[in-house]
Design a protein with these regions (language model features):
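Tryptophan (W) side chains
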Residues: 8-11
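Conserved core of the PLP fold type I
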Residues: 69, 162-303, 320-338, 462-463
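N-terminal mitochondrial targeting presequence
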Residues: 69-99
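Conserved core segment of the aminotransferase class I/II
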Residues: 93-94, 114, 236, 333-432, ...
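N-terminal small-domain helix-loop-helix segment of the aminotransferase-like
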Residues: 100, 110-201, 208, 393-396, ...
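Helix C-cap/helix->beta junction micro-motif
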Residues: 130, 237, 307-308, 429, ...
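Conserved PLP-binding catalytic core of the aspartate aminotransferase-like
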Residues: 143, 409-416, 420, 428-476, ...
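PLP-dependent enzyme catalytic core of the Aspartate aminotransferase-like
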Residues: 221, 270, 454-462, 470-526
Length: 526
């Protein structure tokens, strides 16, 4: 009790009756006049005995002051600890005060309101069970190319200084090769110090861009379906998402639909631009649809961005995965667009090493300098060894680029074969895949199975595709992602008859998928 004795004078002073300067009743211990100084809560007044108050003080160490939202803290504390009078206080009293403080303070920042629930957690957990073929998550389940693995091994076992910090905005050999490689593709003279920022994955690049450019009340145009982080990142920056949907053309009898049939309405898109529009985010090839925006579509977007002085955030992480002879065009390469475009890339998607978490942003210095500020004061630095491995991998690819030995060429060819395999297999059970032009993904229409399906469990307000995926995981052993989560809340009900499949998987995974689909087909009967 030595600690209690040492501080008892402070407690006594806190509880001593004090009179207003002009006379009047003494204040209740713990009372706080509006705008006045905080007053310690008096345990002796609350509990009645010096020993009990000393024990409470010894546990809590300092007087407890609650926020100004309560005019009479003592009255509230008396209500909480009333049942403890005459009893040993201990942890119970602490718990009471912790509960009171919890009620008095808001812990969650308001910018997280409405975005604290993430459906991915649930679907990933369901798909991680044994014997589930996980076609939901977007990562390859096969090794990166041998040259990339060797590059990482060199980085880990070679120069010991690669264990230390490097330049905050990017490991110099990496920023140089990115500037050289993409400068030729974009037709720009890219300065590796001013026009390149290396980030913790493309996710980090997106977050940094939103934080650097989007202010309170700014509007960001998002094209639906969209990679799901675009909306919460806009909200966390204080912006307002403005959605515009790609509209599918009517289905053609006997033919599979293509994602090229999903188009923007030029009039609707133009109507979304206002004086408050700060940015438009463009994902091509897109996730989840796999759409590769045509040059004509990009020119429409570019003209509107220039007309309204809007920044384009171009998420191009799947640029090397384009199928059936389609061509990826970077919007930054169009006339007048380099100076207002941030182009985002991913080493994980480029070299099939998503766990490396190395991404980058390319853009004009007038924009990049603001991303540098955010990066410097948040992430500061990305792992040096991973950056060194990516730099060496790009150097290898640059020597083979455009040749049959190029990894980009070989990976694209293998991914197209996997895409075709998965589409044939899905059709065998009555699903109608939408042919993707690029990316890791395809979406498939599940409408035709509705008549053959049992009533699916789940809440009545839960989108149909969400209930379908849960049923499919549990009953068919196949994991996928409902497409409705890639839409804003008002539009989900219009697109809840699609699911997303990742087809960039190992051959053994695709064979396991085939077995489960064949069993499903047998159960459906003729």
């Amino acid at each position: 009790m030595e600690s209690a004795g040492k501080h008892w004078g402070a407690w006594e002073g806190a509880r001593a009756p004090r009179h207003r300067e002009e006379g009047g009743a003494p204040e209740t211990p713990g009372m706080r006049e509006p705008g006045g100084p905080r007053t310690a809560v008096t345990f002796r007044a609350l509990l009645g005995t010096r020993s009990e108050a000393s024990e409470a003080e010894e546990e809590l160490s300092v007087p407890v002051a609650l926020g100004g939202m309560f005019k009479n803290v003592a009255a509230i504390c008396l209500h909480l600890v009333g049942p403890l009078r005459g009893k040993k206080t201990g942890a119970s009293l602490t718990q009471c005060f912790h509960q009171t403080l919890t009620m008095a303070k808001r812990l969650q920042a308001r910018r997280l309101d409405g975005i604290d629930y993430n459906p991915w957690v649930e679907f990933i957990k369901l798909s991680s069970e044994d014997d589930i073929v996980n076609l939901g998550q977007g990562f390859p389940d096969f090794p990166p190319p041998a040259f990339a693995v060797e590059a990482f091994q060199h980085a880990v076992s070679g120069d010991f200084m690669l264990n230390q910090y490097t330049t905050a905005f990017g490991y110099p050999p990496l920023t140089r090769i990115l500037a050289s490689f993409f400068g030729k593709l974009l037709g720009q003279e890219i300065n590796p110090r001013k026009n390149v920022l290396v980030t913790v994955g493309a996710y980090g690049a997106l977050f940094t861009a939103f934080q650097a450019l989007v202010d309170e009340g700014d509007e960001v145009i998002i094209i639906e379906p969209f990679f799901d982080c675009y909306e919460p990142m806009t909200l966390m920056a204080g912006g307002r998402p403005v959605f515009v949907s790609l509209k599918p053309s009517p289905t053609r009898d006997g033919e599979l639909d293509s994602c090229s049939d999903w188009q923007l309405d030029p009039v609707e898109l133009a109507s979304k631009f206002t004086s408050r529009t700060k940015a438009l985010i463009l994902n091509t090839p897109s996730n989840p649809l796999g759409k590769v925006f045509s040059r004509a579509e990009l020119e429409l977007v570019a003209s509107l961005c220039q007309q309204h002085d809007v920044v384009c955030i171009a998420d191009e992480v799947y640029q090397w995965l384009v199928y059936d002879g389609y061509q990826h065009v970077s919007i930054a390469s169009l006339p007048g667009m380099w100076d207002r475009t941030l182009t985002i890339g991913s080493a994980g998607k480029t070299f099939s090493a998503t766990g490396w978490k190395v991404g980058w942003v390319l853009g004009p210095g007038r924009l990049l300098k603001h991303l540098h500020t955010v990066h410097q004061n948040s992430i500061f630095h990305c792992p040096t060894q991973a950056q060194a491995a990516v730099a060496e991998s790009f150097e290898w690819e640059q020597l083979h680029f455009g040749q049959p030995s190029s990894y980009f060429v070989q990976f694209q060819q293998a991914s197209q074969r996997s895409r075709d395999h998965v589409m044939r297999s899905l059709q065998s059970v009555g699903l109608r895949p939408i042919i993707p032009q690029g990316s890791y993904f395809l979406i498939t229409d599940i409408s035709e199975l509705k008549s053959k399906m049992p009533d699916l469990p789940g809440a009545t307000d839960e989108p149909y595709d969400s209930r379908f995926v849960k049923w499919m995981i549990k009953n068919k052993g196949l994991g996928a992602i409902p497409v409705s989560i890639f839409y804003s809340a008002p539009h989900r009900k219009h697109f809840d008859h699609y699911i997303r499949i990742c087809f960039v998987k190992d051959e053994s995974t695709l064979q396991a998928m085939d077995k489960k689909l064949q069993k499903w087909k047998d159960e459906l009967g003729p």
